[in-house]
Each structure stands twice: as structure tokens, then as C-alpha cells.
A protein has these predicted regions:
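Short, surface-exposed "cap/lid" segments of acyl-processing enzymes
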Residues: 1-7, 388-395
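Structural recognition of the beta-strand scaffold that forms the well-ordered cores
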Residues: 14-19, 65-68, 75-77, 105-111, ...
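C-terminal catalytic histidine-bearing segment of alpha/beta-hydrolase fold enzymes
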Residues: 121-123, 169-247, 252-255, 380-387, ...
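Long, low-complexity, polar/charged, intrinsically disordered or flexibly structured peripheral segments
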Residues: 192-366
Length: 447
């Protein structure tokens, strides 16, 4: 953090870190007190403090830039979407927040794990071409919290065939298909161009184009970039050969005669060979509550709770659909019933409300007074090409929602895939970030 702060200061920026309650915050009795949406409440209070004291603090609090990746990217996107939302007024009044606005100026959303109300479905649409996955060490528990690390292999390189159901029960393939279909319907319901099979229409081809453009930019700028890849692949041609040799690019890549203009010709083949799936199904609200996202939904004693309304409802459908079916053994069907009951017990009306207000796309897609907010005028989403998490479909939904439903409220939204970058603040050259911020600030000062 210190190195990053120094770099920002050298660029002429003022970096502010706001203390906020979060998923690990406990009181003197070790009770958890950082439940959602309190991280948003505290950050908004910090923004209001900066604005209320703008005359005596360095910088300009009307030009706030949110910066974060993964869950931090999600929080930043939420700040940009929910500015001045009345939903938070009561919370802010309770903690004595300053009487000021809390909208921000620029959102830098790196691989934001957000829009959790549709995330489990979006991940199946995004990763449908990946027929195997690995699990992080934290996932080696069953649905009851028992350690099963002696029964399953975890960690990168230990892949399970999709549908292997390593946590027990014949559920994965069936639920994944339902989630995929639900997401196609969901995207279509907002008027976006997505074919019924989820693999044609501008919403799909536009996402694929992000990868094509990302690789093209990488190859075009390869000579000027500082990257460890150059130790093995001294020029763009050598790097391309690496894609053919190590990632089967003959099945998914077409390169123009110039040697740098790339086209991803088969998205699912590309996903299956280049991007690892690092989540089972369901991906974010996992059966064992052990996913990273599950850590945000805890009670005062730290017990995790299921949060996905969608998974709850689809499991309920499966219980009814297969009640008199011979598709599963009695033991397998009983497992599905127990899963459905576990989600139903956790996901109540309050959980539903929290999930909705913490999904930033809702502030853009809905036009009723409840969701009214002041959107950030500038949005920049970056996701690494090697990122197998939920960041790209989440950012893609936000980007399309902003351009379609809020074009008259914002000034710009850009989204890019940064090639050869993992789940991270993905930039192929950090100077690109500085140039983006400086350009917008210069335009603002000239107005």
C-alpha cells in the first residue's frame, strides 16, 4: 500500500483511505458488527466528510475517484451507482454523517465481483465452455461445514470434471443449466441483444470482442511493454507461438497478416483452454458457504448464511421437478431437498433486500423513485484476460446498463480486457491509468 500511495502522490493525486466496518469487524465481545450494507454506509460517510470539509483539505472532493479490485472493485462500483441514494439516508443519519452529498466522479472498477443478485447465473453463462474446475483450499468442506480435504483435491492444477459433484449429490449439471437459461432470460428482459442460446447477439459478441481487442492491443504494444513474458517470448511472434503451443490457439484464434490483429473465433474453446474455472456451481453462494463472497453474509456470531434468492428458488424448482422422477437416486434427491431447505432457511425478505440494494446494476436499470441516485459521470472497467472469476460478466452488465439506460446521465463508460493479467488491478501499463485520470481531470478543469 505504501508503494502505491507514493506512486499516486508522485502523479499529483491525493489518496484517502476511509475507515469502514466490514466482514471482519468485531466489537469488544467478538461479535461481528460489519454486516452489509455498513461498509457502504461508512464509505459514504467518509465521502460526505471530505465534501463538507473541501475548503480546508487538499485536493477537490468533487473529483473523487474510487479505486479497487475484486470486492474492492465491487464497493467502488456501488459508490458510483448509489450516489445520494435515499436508501442509505437512515443509516447515515444514525451515525451522524455530515450533511453533504456522497456521489463520486470516476469509478475505476477492476474485476468487480458485484451484482450478486444475478452473479451465480452470470458465471454459468460466462464459463459454460469450461468443463473442469479447481477449488481453493477454503472450499474443502461439505455443506455441513465438515473438513473433507482428505476426500477431494484442491488448489490450482487439481481439476475436477464439471458435474463431478465433489461436494456430494447429483446437482451441478442440472442447476448450472437452469442458471444459464435464467441469465439469458434476464439479459433479454432488459432489452439487450442476446440470442436464446446465449451464444449470439451483440451482448455476447461484444463480450468476445473484448478479448480480441485485448490481445490485439497486447501484441501491438508488446515491444514497449515491461512484462516478465519477454524473458521467454522476446517478441510478439514468439508470444503468439506460445499461445498455439501451450493453449491450443489453433482452435480459437485467428491472426491477421499484420501479425497483431487478433480475433477470438471460438469463445467456448478459448475459455476451456485459456481461462481456468475456479468455482463450482453455484459459484458465489456455494453449497458449503465457503466461497469468498459468502464471508460478507454472516450473523453476529460469525456464522455464514446463504444469500442467493436465485439459487434458493431454482433449487426449490428442482425439488418439485424431480419429486417423482427416477433421474436421481433416493439419496441424491434427498441431498437436493436438504440443500433447498438450507437456502430457504437463510434467504428471507431482509436477505433479499440487502442483495438487491448491494447490486449496483439495479440503480441503473430501474427508473422508479426507490432506485433514484446520482451516477458517477465517468466509468472505467478493466479485467485481466486470465481472470476466471465473475468480474467480467458483472462489469459487462454494468457497462451495457450505463450506456443503454443512463446515457444522458453519464459522460462515458469504457471497458477493456487487459491481456495476460490475472484477477488483479489489471493494466498492461499503469501509465494508461494515469493518462485516463489526467485526461478527464484536464477536461473538467477546462469547463
Amino acid at each position: 500500500m505504501q508503494d502505491v500511495t507514493i506512486a499516486y502522490m508522485q502523479e499529483g493525486y491525493v489518496q484517502v483511505s476511509v475507515g469502514a466496518r466490514g466482514k471482519d469487524t468485531v466489537d469488544a465481545e467478538d461479535h461481528y458488527i460489519g454486516q452489509l450494507p455498513l461498509i457502504m454506509v461508512d464509505l459514504k460517510a467518509g465521502i460526505r466528510y471530505l465534501k463538507a470539509n473541501n475548503d480546508v483539505l487538499p485536493g477537490d472532493a468533487e473529483r473523487i475517484v474510487s479505486y479497487g479490485y475484486s470486492s474492492g472493485g465491487a464497493v467502488g462500483v456501488m459508490l458510483g451507482a448509489s450516489g445520494n441514494s435515499a436508501i442509505y439516508d437512515g443509516y447515515l443519519a444514525d451515525i451522524g454523517a455530515a450533511d453533504a452529498t456522497d456521489d463520486i466522479f470516476i469509478v475505476l472498477g477492476y474485476c468487480p465481483i458485484t451484482n450478486l443478485d444475478s452473479a451465480d447465473a452470470a458465471y454459468e453463462w460466462f464459463q459454460a465452455g469450461n468443463q473442469e474446475y479447481f477449488l481453493f483450499n477454503a472450499m474443502a468442506v461439505d455443506m455441513y461445514g465438515n473438513d473433507i480435504s482428505d476426500q477431494i483435491t484442491v488448489g490450482r492444477g487439481n481439476f475436477h470434471p464439471f458435474g463431478d459433484n465433489v461436494l456430494g449429490g447429483a446437482h451441478e449439471d442440472e442447476l448450472a443449466a437452469k442458471l444459464y437459461d435464467w441469465y439469458v432470460d434476464y439479459v433479454q428482459s432488459w432489452g439487450f441483444d442476446l440470442g436464446d442460446d446465449g451464444r449470439d447477439g451483440a451482448y455476447f459478441t461484444g463480450l468476445v470482442q473484448l478479448y480480441s481487442d485485448g490481445l490485439t492491443q497486447w501484441l501491438t504494444r508488446y515491444d514497449e511493454l515491461s512484462t516478465p513474458d519477454k524473458e521467454k517470448y522476446p517478441d510478439a511472434a514468439a508470444y503468439v507461438q506460445h499461445l498455439y503451443d501451450d493453449y491450443g490457439a489453433d482452435a480459437w484464434l485467428e491472426l491477421a497478416e499484420d501479425g497483431v490483429t487478433a480475433t477470438i473465433t471460438d469463445y467456448d474453446a478459448f475459455m476451456g483452454s485459456f481461462i481456468s474455472r475456479n468455482k463450482m456451481c453455484p459459484s458465489l453462494d456455494s453449497y458449503n458457504k465457503a466461497s469468498n463472497e459468502g464471508s460478507a453474509f454472516v450473523d453476529a456470531d460469525g456464522n455464514r448464511k446463504h444469500f442467493s434468492v436465485l439459487v434458493r428458488d431454482l433449487l426449490g424448482e428442482m425439488v418439485e421437478e424431480y419429486r417423482d422422477s427416477d433421474a436421481f437416486t433416493a439419496e441424491e434427491y434427498d441431498y437436493i431437498v436438504r440443500l433447498a431447505d438450507a437456502y430457504a432457511a437463510d434467504v428471507d425478505d431482509e436477505a433479499t433486500r440487502l442483495l438487491e440494494i448491494m447490486s449496483p446494476a439495479n440503480y441503473v436499470l430501474h427508473d422508479d423513485a426507490y432506485w433514484a441516485s446520482t451516477l458517477a459521470p465517468h466509468w472505467r472497467f478493466h479485467i485481466g484476460s486470465a481472470d476466471g472469476d465473475h468480474g467480467l460478466p458483472a462489469a459487462w452488465l454494468m457497462h451495457n446498463a450505463l450506456l443503454t439506460y443512463a446515457a444522458d446521465e453519464i459522460e462515458d463508460s469504457v471497458i477493456e480486457v487487459s491481456w495476460d493479467q490475472p484477477h488483479s488491478p489489471a493494466e498492461i501499463d499503469v501509465q494508461d491509468l494515469y493518462d485516463y485520470i489526467d485526461g478527464i481531470m484536464a477536461d473538467a478543469l477546462s469547463e
